[in-house]
Amino acid sequence: SLPRIMEIFYWPFLDLVIWGFITLYLARYQSQVPGFVTFFLGALILWDMLFRSQQGITISFLEELWARNLMNLFASPLKPSEFLTATMAMSVMKVAVVSIVMAGCALLFYSYNILIVGVWLMPFILNLVVTGWIIGVFTTSLIMRFGQEAEVLAWSMVFLFQPISCVFYPMEVLPEWLQMIALANPAAHIFEGMRTVLATGAPPVGNLAWAVCLNGALLVGVIAWFYRTVAYCKDQGLLVRVGE
C-alpha cells in the first residue's frame, strides 16, 4: 500500500536529503554566514505558514470525505470556485493562528523576533500562502481522482517540495540539475529572499517578482486542473466510490 511504501522509502529518503543539504550548508559556509539561528528559526516559521496553508485546503476536503458528504457536496448547487474559496479562507485562518503562536513561542523561548524581516515579511507570507494553496489544490485533485488510498498525500505531498524550497539552506547548495527545478518553485525564491534580507538588508525585489509570477501561473493552472478533475469524477461516478 502507498502508506507502507512511504513509511519504508519516502520519509527516510526525505530526511537524508534535507539533512544532507543542511550539513553541506553548515560545512561550506559556517565561517562566512553568521547567525544560523536567525536563518533557521525564520525559515521554520515561514515554512510552517506554507504547510498550514496547504493543510487548510486538503484537510477541509478530507473532513467532507470522512463524513461521507462528498457526493452531496458536489451534487449540490455549490460551484468548485465556491468550494475553493471556502477552503482557502479556512487555510488563511489556520495560518493566522499558527503564525501568532509560533512567533510568540520563538520570542518567548529564543528571543527571536520574526519582525526583524521588516516590511518584506507580509509579501513573503502572502506568497507562501498562495504556494500552499497550489500544493493543496493539487493534492486535493489527486485524492479526488484516486480515492482514499491517496489520503496520505494530504500530509506528505508538501514535504516533497521541501528540498527544492531551500528552506534551511541557499539554492547554491543544491546540485546544478536540482537548482533548475528549484527555480520553478515559488517558495525557493521566498526563502532566498528571506536570507538576503537577514544577511545583507538588501531588498529582495527580484526574488519576490519571480515568486509572484510563478505563483500566478501555477495557481491558474492548478485551479483549471481541479475543475477538470471534478468534471471527470462526476462523469465517471468516482465521487461515489471516493466517499465510500
Predicted regions and their residues:
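Hydrophobic transmembrane alpha-helices and immediately adjacent juxtamembrane helices
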Residues: 1-244
